[in-house]
Design a protein with these regions (language model features):
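Residue-level detector of the transmembrane beta-barrel scaffold of outer-membrane proteins
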Residues: 2, 31-35, 91, 111-115, ...
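Predominantly the C-terminal beta-signal and adjacent terminal strand-loop region
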Residues: 36, 42, 160-179
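A structural signal for short secondary-structure junctions
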Residues: 83-86, 104-109, 114, 147-151, ...
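Short Gly/Pro-enriched loop/turn and capping motifs at secondary-structure junctions
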Residues: 99, 118-123, 162, 174-176
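Outer-membrane beta-barrel transmembrane domain signature
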Residues: 29, 97, 111-153
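C-terminal outer-membrane beta-barrel translocator/porin domains of Gram-negative envelope proteins
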Residues: 1-106, 122-124, 139
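Short proline/glycine-enriched turn/loop segments at secondary-structure junctions
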Residues: 102-103, 145, 175-178
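Short beta-alpha connecting loops at secondary-structure transitions
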Residues: 73-75, 137-141, 151, 167-172
Length: 179
C-alpha cells in the first residue's frame, strides 16, 4: 500500500496532459518528427510551489521532467525556467542517418538532427510581486507572462545500435538570452 505524500499532507491537485507525437519518413534515412504537448492544472486546489514545475511526460524520467526547458521539453532553454498553471510546447526536428555500418556482427548508424523547440505559458501562476522591486520585476518576470514564446534551435548527434538503442546528444541555443 502506497500513498502520495501530497495527499497525506492535504494538498491534492490534478494535472492533465495531452501529448501528440508523429513521425514522417521523407526519404531514405531522413525523417521529420514532432511532438505537441499541452498541460494544465485542473480544479480549484492550488499546486504547492515545490510541485508546480512537474511535467507529465511520455516516459518516466525522474527529476528531469520538471518545468519547460531542458532535454525533456524545450531543448536550449534552462531547465525549470518557464513554469505556469497551463503550458504548451512543441518539438520539431529533422533526423538524418548519414552512416550505416556493421561491427562485431551488430548494426550501427550515425545520425544528426536539427531542431526547433518552443513553449509558452498559457495560464500564469498567480504570484504576489508587491515585495519585488520594479527593476527585479522587469529583469526576472517580464518575459514570463501568458502568451510569450520561449524558443530555441539546435543540432544533435545520434549513435544507433540495432535501431532500438540510441545514444543522443543535443545542443540548443535559446533565442532570448534570458531563457
Amino acid at each position: 500500500l502506497t500513498a502520495d505524500l501530497r495527499y497525506i499532507l492535504g494538498i491534492p491537485h490534478t494535472k492533465l496532459a495531452i501529448i501528440h507525437r508523429q513521425y514522417f519518413s521523407l526519404a531514405k534515412d531522413l525523417q521529420f518528427a514532432y511532438r505537441l504537448d499541452y498541460q494544465t492544472t485542473l480544479g480549484s486546489n492550488k499546486v504547492p510551489y515545490f510541485a508546480q514545475p512537474e511535467l507529465i511526460t511520455s516516459f518516466l524520467i525522474a527529476a528531469s521532467n520538471q518545468g519547460l526547458g531542458g532535454k525533456s521539453s524545450v531543448r536550449g532553454i534552462l531547465r525549470n525556467r518557464v513554469v505556469g498553471d497551463a503550458v504548451g510546447f512543441g518539438n520539431f526536428e529533422f533526423r538524418y542517418k548519414f552512416l550505416r555500418f556493421e561491427w562485431l556482427k551488430q548494426n550501427f548508424y550515425l545520425g544528426t538532427n536539427v531542431f526547433f523547440d518552443s513553449g509558452l505559458v498559457l495560464k500564469p501562476i498567480e504570484m504576489d510581486l508587491s515585495a519585488v522591486s520594479a527593476t527585479d520585476r522587469a529583469t526576472y518576470f517580464s518575459n514570463y507572462e501568458s502568451g510569450k514564446f520561449h524558443s530555441a534551435a539546435g543540432i544533435g548527434l545520434k549513435i544507433g545500435w540495432n535501431e532500438n538503442f540510441v545514444i543522443s546528444a543535443d545542443y540548443g541555443k535559446a533565442f532570448n538570452k534570458q531563457d
